[in-house]
């Protein structure tokens, strides 16, 4: 986060047909197209297909409701994952949530929103950030909603064994503008600094009285 921050426009390094949201793949490739006009139609078709898939997934996410039998359904967080190995990609629901927030804020038609994507206009973020999966073994401890320090358990028992807890954390990049100030701020008149901010997610933890349970803890979620 950054006070008095404003984006600075620069030349885009993305192609006009690039998709800004990984994790979903559309069918078709541009090598089978015969000419410039066909290539343009192909890019439009791929973008439309991508939008259609996104809309379907968002609709399905709204329809799905946790059943009464699944009492742990509400413990799930988009930035927490239980897995036997390190996840290879960002969580899909996290990507959908980020995209949905952008759509809600834009309040435009899908086609207009696509062309107003900051990645297409060549805009850069005020602060650079990096995201990665972090294990409970790396976190070890965290602060819960009451301000107490709790131990983050590395493994979660499941019917067929144990799974590890992984947290998808986002923090300010150590390179670039993190130390020099926020991008787009006139240094002659303003002092600025990019800082990592935190949010609460639910995780399996143990307090100082050895009581194990699901609690909200703070993790790094933005810059």
Curated annotation (Swiss-Prot):
* Sites where a glycan is attached: 107
GO molecular function: any one? growth factor activity
What residue ranges are annotated as transmembrane? none
Superkingdom, natural source: Eukaryota
GO cellular component terms listed in the entry, alphabetical order: axon; dendrite; extracellular space; synaptic vesicle
Tell me the disulfide pairings in this chain.
Answer: 127-194, 172-223
Give the function comment from the record.
Promotes the survival of neuronal populations that are all located either in the central nervous system or directly connected to it.
Do you know which Pfam families this protein is assigned to?
A: NGF
Describe the family membership recorded for this protein in Swiss-Prot or TrEMBL: Belongs to the NGF-beta family.
What's the name of the protein?
Answer: Neurotrophic factor BDNF precursor form
Q: What is the lineage of its organism?
A: Eukaryota, Metazoa, Chordata, Craniata, Vertebrata
Where does this protein reside within or beyond the cell? Secreted
